[in-house]
Swiss-Prot record:
GO CC, any one term: membrane
Biased composition (Low complexity): 251-298
One Gene Ontology MF term: helicase activity
Location within or outside the cell: Membrane
Transmembrane segments: 65-85, 106-126, 131-151, 163-183, 194-214, 227-247, 286-306, 316-336, 361-381, 394-414, 419-439, 450-470, 487-507, 558-578
Keyword DNA-binding attached: no
Protein name as it appears in the record: Uncharacterized protein YHL050C
Biased composition, class Basic and acidic residues, residue ranges: 299-321
Topology with respect to the bilayer: Multi-pass membrane protein
Region (Disordered): 246-321
Keywords from the UniProt entry: Membrane, Transmembrane, Transmembrane helix
Species this chain originates from: Saccharomyces cerevisiae (strain ATCC 204508 / S288c)
Length: 697
């Protein structure tokens, strides 16, 4: 099987089909120079959980759902993704596999992350489950050649069914004759990939060997494991026994001629029960065994064999009777806790402050507050140490309650972010000064915030109606609908192809000159930072930016100073997983379109450089004012996650072709500081005069 790129195996249940791929996957995972990512697909959702637990139980494999891969991309940690047939047939999955090499290079900056095995269980379902065949159509779009090996398993599929099932998902089918692997390697088919190979069938049901199932009965002089049977010379495992004048302490017992250690006991004439055994003058109970002159000290005591137990009893320190310490709050604290629990009843769930305000789940999805944590808050605001982490009170005055998943402090962080959504930089700075009495009291701030609950809800609905309409794809931005844009910018008269060409030209110039990306898009400063372009992972990338002082300049020059000192830096590590996944997926679709047109694929920026660009544009006040003036369908957004989400919507260019908004942003940014685009300069006086206008004026 090692020389066969595609195999189908038919074997009865219990024969060991799982180990057929489990052991090779462990071997792949143990390779240090290359990281392999494999995929297993089962027919039904009910099989997922048990399958993941079984394969990940030994700790040799990191196992995760395929949904994580589809939504977020490869995380660089998981060895095996497990999903169902619907995942295998989904467009997002096939697109990610098609663009695997490009995505890996952009994400991990290395080619040492490869696709390993594709395993499909219960292969016969592709042919026999006629009512689901329409759902399997997308599997034919999968690039099987990208995988190192494909394994198809079934317990019931004869060769005819297996052959039809393989052809239904786009493969050649079963081999019609025995294959000489040496001849196969010499053939021209070898260059066409796995999908052109006929699949070799291993029918283990025809084998005459028998596999014993279950447990065997016990005989004289046998060892009984997890069963209840004893003989004259038998050894009972997982039980404890005592005999005349013997002492049983937890799991060990002694007899006249034998010694039982840890979990084994031997007796001359013993009777085995579920947990304990007693002899001639003994009594069997569920946990303790006693004899005629013995005492079983299950509570960490030793018994005296000659009956004088009191003088020889040993009392360890842990046996001193002590009432467990319990914090006893005052009646005022208990009353406060009850009031807060009534006011915020859903903190036992994964609740956020938008849910508390009354927004629907579909609205929360786009008004998301991911990346809002302690680092979002300025220094000194809800960041005190040495106090309760949940409510920032002294421990004896803590008002948190058992089972609380969302702490009051976390809700206060999110409430502060909601207030930021509604205020520009100057207004937010004043707001932070107004709430100074609550800087060390998130619970008090939540009470203050909840008083304006309805007012805040209405404000968000008014101010972000345009944002929800665009991000929920209910409205599409068209540059031709922006009168000011058509009159004031050449970019708004470009075709979609021209905008894309300009976007790739900008990135090509940045790459050649090794320009620091974030600083360039922040203020058009073309400082060099070669370490940034040579960085192999996110950590090295951030260290390169920190070394040249990018984050310090950003905090001193822009509104980034209104957040914690680590806030921008952490955007490159643990936040924006969904956006990263969407961006990587767009690379795959872009690559596929270029290959279909016969065009040489363009070099696209990797994720960290792309995120640097969007962060630089977000904090570039001059650019933001110009874009909002020219593009009349959008208004201000004051949270970085909202800006990133907005930048990834599609807009209609002058020729009605779709381009991502971030490409249009880069073109406008280039127009502000370049002679490459005619009429590139913009009237700053006019911009400042109209920067305070309302959308729609």
């Amino acid at each position: 099987m090692a020389d066969t790129p595609s195999v189908a195996v038919q074997a009865p249940p219990g024969y060991g089909k799982t180990e057929l791929f489990h052991l090779p996957l462990i071997a792949l995972a143990s390779k240090g120079d290359v990281e392999y990512v494999s995929f297993l697909f089962v027919p039904y959702t009910v099989l997922l959980a048990n399958c993941m637990i079984r394969l990940g139980r030994c700790g040799c494999l990191n196992v995760a759902p395929v949904r994580n891969f589809i939504e977020e991309g490869c995380d660089g940690v998981t060895d095996l993704y497990v999903g169902i047939y619907d995942d295998l047939a989904s467009t997002n999955f096939t697109d990610r596999i098609a663009a695997w090499e490009n995505i890996v290079e952009c994400t991990f900056r290395t080619n040492n992350v490869k696709l390993g095995y594709l395993i499909v269980d219960e292969l016969h379902n592709f042919e026999t489950e006629v009512y689901r065949q329409s759902q399997f159509g997308g599997i034919t779009n999968l690039d099987f050649d990208a995988f190192e090996k494909a394994i198809f398993l079934s317990g019931t599929a004869p060769e005819a069914v297996a052959d039809a099932a393989l052809q239904r998902i786009g493969l050649t089918g079963l081999a019609k004759k025995s294959m000489d692997i040496n001849e196969l390697k010499r053939s021209e088919d070898l260059s066409r990939g796995l999908s052109s190979y006929p699949t070799r069938m291993f029918n283990l049901i025809k084998e005459k060997s028998k596999v014993p199932l279950g447990t065997n009965a016990t005989t004289t002089a046998s060892t009984n494991v997890r069963t209840s049977a004893t003989t004259t010379a038998s050894i009972n495992v997982r039980t404890s026994a005592t005999t005349t004048a013997s002492i049983n302490v937890r799991t060990s017992a002694t007899t006249t001629e034998s010694t039982n250690s840890n979990t084994n006991a031997t007796t001359t004439e013993s009777t085995n029960s579920s947990t304990n055994a007693t002899t001639t003058a003994s009594t069997n109970s569920s946990t303790n065994a006693t004899t005629t002159e013995s005492t079983n000290a299950s509570a960490k005591e030793d018994a005296n064999k000659d009956g004088n137990a009191e003088d020889n009893r040993f009392h360890p320190v842990t046996d001193i009777n002590k009432e467990p310490y319990k914090r006893k709050g005052s009646q005022m604290v208990l009353l406060e806790r009850k009031k807060l629990k009534a006011q915020f009843p859903n903190t036992s769930e994964n609740m956020n402050v938008l849910q508390f305000l009354g927004f629907r789940s579909d609205e929360i999805k786009h008004l998301f507050l991911y990346g809002i944590d302690i680092y979002f808050c300025p220094e000194g605001v809800f960041t005190q140490y040495g106090l309760c982490k949940g409510c920032q009170k002294m421990f004896e005055l803590c008002v948190c309650w058992a089972g609380q998943k969302v702490s009051y402090r976390r809700m206060a962080w999110e409430a502060l972010a909601v207030e930021r959504m509604l205020r520009n930089d100057e207004e937010y700075k004043e707001y932070l000064e107004d709430i100074e009495p609550y800087h060390g009291d998130p619970v008090g701030y939540l009470k203050f915030f909840s008083v304006k609950r309805r007012e805040i809800y209405s404000q968000i609905q008014r101010n972000y109606a345009w944002y929800l309409a665009i991000t929920r794809r209910r409205e599409t931005i068209s540059v031709l609908d922006s009168t000011r844009g058509k009159q004031g910018s050449q970019v708004f008269r470009m075709s979609g192809r021209q905008i894309k060409e300009l976007y790739y030209k900008v990135w090509s110039n940045l790459r050649e000159s090794k320009t620091e990306v974030l600083q360039y898009f922040l203020n058009w400063d073309e400082k060099k930072c070669q370490e940034e372009w040579e960085a192999k992972d996110d950590t090295v990338f951030v260290e390169a930016l920190e070394k040249v002082g990018v984050f310090q300049r950003l905090r001193s020059m822009t509104s980034a100073g209104l957040q914690g000192p680590q806030y921008v830096k952490l955007q490159f590590s643990r936040h924006h997983r969904q956006l990263r996944s969407r961006y990587e997926l767009s690379l795959g679709m872009h690559l596929r379109d270029q290959l279909a047109l016969g065009v040489t694929p363009s070099k696209v920026p990797h994720w960290t450089a792309f995120l640097s660009m969007l962060i630089g544009l977000f904090y570039n006040k001059t650019f933001r004012q110009k874009l909002e003036y020219l593009l009349e369908q959008i208004s201000e957004v004051w949270l970085l996650p909202h800006w990133l989400d907005l930048a990834n919507v599609e807009v209609l260019a002058a020729d009605n072709t779709r381009v991502p908004l971030y490409m249009l942003m880069v073109a406008v940014h280039k127009e502000l500081d370049s002679d490459d685009v005619p009429d590139g300069r913009f009237d700053i006086i006019l911009l400042c005069r109209d920067s305070s206008r309302e959308v729609g004026e």
